[in-house]
Structures are given as structure tokens and as C-alpha cells.
């Protein structure tokens, strides 16, 4: 059925259908607290710029029987969710012109960078390792620098020196391969081209402070440690708080459910502050390449993993680090977001976030379809009402509906023989002036059989109808539907009569 995605119209909360879905999400997460090592959990669901629900479970410190429950301001390590921030830096520098193109080679910003690519064609080597691929899982770089752990304390120049004798494990842009190295290298290289000259300072001044994310950062100070939910391994043993050194951009950060909700709202285009222009934000949230079945996601993007679920692309960034697990996820067509933070390992079995979306997606879709407003009427229907024809092949009647809205009815012997009555009449939603928008229905078949062909209702839905300037009688002499390549649909003096 179409439209495949409902319009993300404002909703008047609370709605029973959403309340029921959120209660089921609460139950799913509450039951997951019985998994080994999971001590605390905080979650938040966002729609548009509104927090629909928060859930907090367990104890902030699972080792202390007297510990209180966490809340949306409890800090957790967010591990690979940190990778979102180097990508935001890349896109902002691109908007500001410091980065000329997302497809610039890394060498343009790190002149001493070189690495062997034994799997690539000679003609492709010159543009293989581009910034866009560095910001996704398409760089082909190894997971980490040779002979280093996540605790390595070296410099970016030392990293570049190590890469000279290393090899790409995948030809860039050809296959999804997870690399922590790529995001840390991207962050440190780009930071050298900013006024701050320091990655962490740039993130604080350009992302965290503007969004009011005061409880998000990098340094595990005594105050931060006191507010962190205590992390545990699956065995129940407390996990240490490692400092990731040079790899900090890829996994060092801590945050709260409340702060990550602010980031989700900004990326969905809501709230008072936007991080990126709409065109850049759309590029940021688009997939780059489908991943093979063995990979853990359907598609990769910058820096996202995309998972297909119930007809939607769920945009996700998951992170797992000793004692902690986290997921930041968005469904842009619905302007829906879900953040999940755990002190403890990710529970085994069916994915918690996917189970939550199994409840949220159909509920929100239903709520949006039911809340969709009727077609807006024009100030007066008179200039547009009447009979029209396209080359004496198809015939239309435009008339006012009960609420003053315009309706476009297609008629004639052939139409009446082939098209069901319910789909011969489309609403015309008034936009401004003489421009209207075709609206089939809240829900309809995407296509109908039409003799030996098919009539695409999906193609008609949402198309603009541009009526001509009014004549001296105050009537529009016709209209065009440019999106359907239909021009010169002209007014008739009266209702046509068809010979049988």
C-alpha cells in the first residue's frame, strides 16, 4: 500500500496507540535487565523535537545495594557512538569550505599519508582513499594501526609513519570493512586544519556547546567518574575505565540519554539549533553502499550502519566497550529516534533496539496516518471549478468538496470501464496562489491494472497542479501537471457528451 511512508505531521500527545507501544518497549527493556552483567539501562524515544518516553532500569552502581536507579542524566560511556562526531566535523568543514569536497583524497589534508593497496587497480589508486570513505566503513584501512591497541598513546605523525609499511585490507569503496583507525585518523588530520587545532576542543565548541550537551565529553575526571553508571563484564566483574589515547575520537566519549536526545533532535531537523544545512544533513543520513550478507548491517553510511526493518531504513550507530554498550538510532522519514545506553554488555538473543522498533514503527505510522490533515481548500473554488480535457483523450471535472476543498474527478467511458470508482477522484490540496497538490488518499494501492498496463497511483500522489492565470471571466483556462509531463489540460465550455 502507498504512500509507503506517512507524512511526519505534528501529533497531539498522548495518543493511545503510541502509549501502548511505549509500554511494550518498557516491558522489553525491563525484561532485558535479567541478562548477565547488565546493571543499569537508560533509554529515550524522540519524535520530531519531543521526548515521547524515557526509561531507566537497574542500579547506577550494581555493586552497591544502596545505589539508586539511573536517570536520563546518568552518564554512560558511549564507545563507537563517538564516531558520529568526526563525521560531523567533516561535514561542517565541508560546509565552511575548509574541506573542498567530501570526495577529496586524504593526501590533500595529510601530505605524508601513503599506504599500499595490493587489491586495487592502478587507475583507481589515485582516488581510492577519499574522505567520504574514511567517514564510513569503506576506507579499506585495517581495524587498528599495526601492533597497537586502543590504549596506544602515539601521535598522528607516528600513525602516518606506521601506515607507510602497511596495506589496505579491502580496496576502498568496494566492500564494507569496520575500521576504528579510519575515524581517529580522519579526526586528527582534519583538526589540524581548524582554528582550534585540536579535535576535542572543536567538538566542544561546535557541537556540544551549541546543542547544550553539557554532560557529554571525553575526559574521565573525578566528577565524571562519580556520575558514571558503573560498567560490568558479563561475568559480573567490574570493568575498568580505560583512556583510549590516540583512538579517543573513535570511542572515548561519555554522554547521557538526555544529551543524546538533543543530538537526535538536531539531526532530525527539529529544535532551535541545527548542526548542518538541510542538504548536508540529507547527505549525512544517506547510505553509501550495500554490505554483503556476512556483514552486521544491510548498508553503510557516514558513519552509520543501516538496517532494513518494516519498510524503513533504521539509521544506527552501535558501540560496545569494556563494561558498556550503546545504540544511537534514527528513522528519518518518521522523525523518530531511539537511544539506548547500558552499563554492562549487550544482552544475548534478539536485538533490543530492533524489538523496540517492531513496536514503535507500526504504532507511529498508524498515528501519523490518522492525524494527517484533510486537503486545504483555496480561498474560493470558483476560478478552478469546471470541466477540462487533455487533447480530447482524458477528461476531468474539478469541483468543490463539502469543506470547500477541490476535488479532481477523471471520467469518460474508458476510465469508467477500467478504474474503480474510489480512485477516479483525487483531492487537490491548496498550497498557495494557483498551485495545488494531488492527494490520492490516506492509504491506497500503489498501482492499479489498467487494461494491458498499470496506473501508478503512487506516481500521481503528491504531484503539483499549476492552474493558469485567470481570464477576464475570472476563470482559469487550464492547468499543467509538470511532474507527470502533462501540459495544456484545457477548460471546456460545458460537460462533454460521449457517444455510445
Curated annotation (Swiss-Prot):
Pfam families: Beta-lactamase (PF00144)
Membrane-traversing stretches: none
InterPro entries attached to this UniProt entry: Beta-lactam-related, Beta-lactam/transpept-like, Beta-lactamase-like_AB/R
Entry-linked SUPFAM superfamilies: beta-lactamase/transpeptidase-like (SSF56601)
Family named by the database record: Belongs to the beta-lactamase family.
Protein name: Putative beta-lactamase-like 1
Organism: Homo sapiens (Human)
Amino acid at each position: 500500500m502507498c504512500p509507503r511512508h506517512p507524512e511526519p505531521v505534528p501529533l497531539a500527545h498522548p495518543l493511545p496507540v503510541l502509549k501502548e507501544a511505549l509500554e511494550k518497549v518498557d516491558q522489553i527493556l525491563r525484561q532485558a535487565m535479567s541478562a548477565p552483567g547488565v546493571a543499569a539501562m537508560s533509554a529515550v524515544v524522540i519524535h520530531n523535537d519531543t521526548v515521547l518516553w524515557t526509561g531507566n532500569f537497574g542500579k547506577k552502581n550494581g555493586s552497591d545495594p544502596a545505589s539508586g536507579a539511573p536517570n536520563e542524566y546518568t552518564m554512560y560511556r558511549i564507545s563507537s557512538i563517538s564516531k558520529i562526531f568526526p563525521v560531523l566535523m567533516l561535514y561542517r568543514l565541508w560546509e565552511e569550505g575548509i574541506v573542498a569536497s567530501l570526495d577529496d583524497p586524504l593526501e590533500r589534508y595529510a601530505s605524508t599519508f601513503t599506504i599500499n593497496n595490493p587489491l586495487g587497480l592502478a587507475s583507481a589508486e589515485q582516488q581510492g582513499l577519499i574522505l567520504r570513505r574514511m567517514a564510513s566503513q569503506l576506507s579499506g584501512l585495517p581495524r587498528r594501526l599495526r601492533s597497537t591497541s586502543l590504549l596506544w598513546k602515539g601521535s598522528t605523525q607516528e600513525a602516518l609513519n606506521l601506515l607507510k609499511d602497511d596495506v589496505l585490507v579491502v580496496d576502498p569503496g568496494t566492500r564494507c570493512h569496520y575500521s576504528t583507525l579510519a575515524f581517529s585518523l580522519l579526526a586528527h588530520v582534519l583538526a589540524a586544519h581548524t582554528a582550534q587545532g585540536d579535535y576535542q576542543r572543536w567538538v566542544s565548541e561546535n557541537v556540544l556547546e551549541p546543542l547544550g550537551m553539557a554532560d557529554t565529553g571525553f575526559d574521565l575526571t573525578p566528577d565524571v567518574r562519580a556520575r558514571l553508571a558503573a560498567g560490568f563484564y558479563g561475568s559480573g566483574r567490574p570493568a575498568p575505565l580505560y583512556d583510549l589515547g590516540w583512538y579517543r575520537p573513535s570511542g572515548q566519549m561519555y554522554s547521557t540519554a538526555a544529551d543524546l536526545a538533543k543530538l537526535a533532535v538536531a539531526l532530525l531537523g527539529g529544535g532551535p539549533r541545527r548542526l548542518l544545512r538541510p542538504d548536508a544533513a540529507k547527505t549525512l543520513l544517506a547510505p553509501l553502499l550495500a554490505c554483503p550478507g556476512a556483514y552486521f548491517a544491510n548498508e553503510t553510511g557516514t558513519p552509520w550502519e543501516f538496517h532494513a526493518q518494516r519498510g524503513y531504513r533504521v539509521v544506527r550507530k552501535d558501540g560496545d566497550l569494556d563494561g558498556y554498550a550503546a545504540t544511537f538510532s534514527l528513522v528519518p522519514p518518521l522523525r523518530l529516534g531511539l537511544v539506548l545506553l547500558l552499563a554492562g554488555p549487550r544482552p544475548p538473543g534478539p536485538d533490543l533496539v530492533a524489538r523496540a522498533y517492531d513496536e514503535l514503527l507500526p504504532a507511529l505510522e498508524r498515528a501519523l496516518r490518522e492525524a494527517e490533515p484533510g486537503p486545504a481548500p483555496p480561498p474560493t473554488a470558483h476560478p478552478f471549478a469546471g470541466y477540462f480535457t487533455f487533447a480530447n483523450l482524458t477528461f476531468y471535472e474539478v469541483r468543490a468538496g463539502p469543506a470547500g476543498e477541490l476535488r479532481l474527478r477523471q471520467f469518460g467511458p474508458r476510465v469508467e470501464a477500467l478504474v474503480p470508482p474510489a480512485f477516479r477522484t483525487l483531492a487537490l490540496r491548496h498550497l498557495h496562489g494557483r498551485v495545488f497538490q494531488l492527494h490520492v488518499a490516506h492509504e491506497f494501492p500503489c498501482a492499479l491494472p489498467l487494461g494491458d498496463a498499470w496506473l501508478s497511483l503512487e506516481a500521481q500522489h503528491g504531484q503539483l497542479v499549476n492552474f493558469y492565470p485567470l481570464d477576464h471571466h475570472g476563470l482559469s483556462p487550464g492547468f499543467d501537471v509538470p511532474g507527470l509531463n502533462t501540459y495544456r489540460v484545457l477548460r471546456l465550455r460545458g460537460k462533454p457528451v460521449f457517444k455510445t
